[in-house]
Regions:
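Residue-identity detector for glutamine
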Residues: 22, 43-44, 56, 70
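Short, conserved loop-to-beta-strand elements that form functional interface hotspots
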Residues: 38-47
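C-terminal structural segments of small proteins and small subunits
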Residues: 51-74
Length: 74
């Protein structure tokens, strides 16, 4: 039996939503082991002087806990 956990992260990009997603997943996998999936919970843009200056995504990252860490949920 495996147990998964979900954590929410926020990522930004000056290029696009796709770049914000890629950057967020890349950063999450540097410190979270066993990442299995991610879904975009929210998307936002920041506008200055009538132009988009930043894309932001909130991602829900799902990862499977190591056997030794499953007690952490108790």
């Amino acid at each position: 039996m495996s147990i998964a956990r979900i954590t929410e992260i926020s990522s930004t990009s000056k290029k696009s939503f796709e770049d914000a997603i890629q950057s967020g997943v890349a950063r999450a996998t540097k410190t979270i082991r066993n990442v299995r999936s991610a879904w975009v919970k929210e998307q936002q843009i920041r506008i200055e002087n009538n132009s988009i200056v930043e894309y932001q995504v909130n991602l829900m990252i799902t990862f499977v806990l190591d056997e030794g860490n499953q007690a952490d949920l108790a």
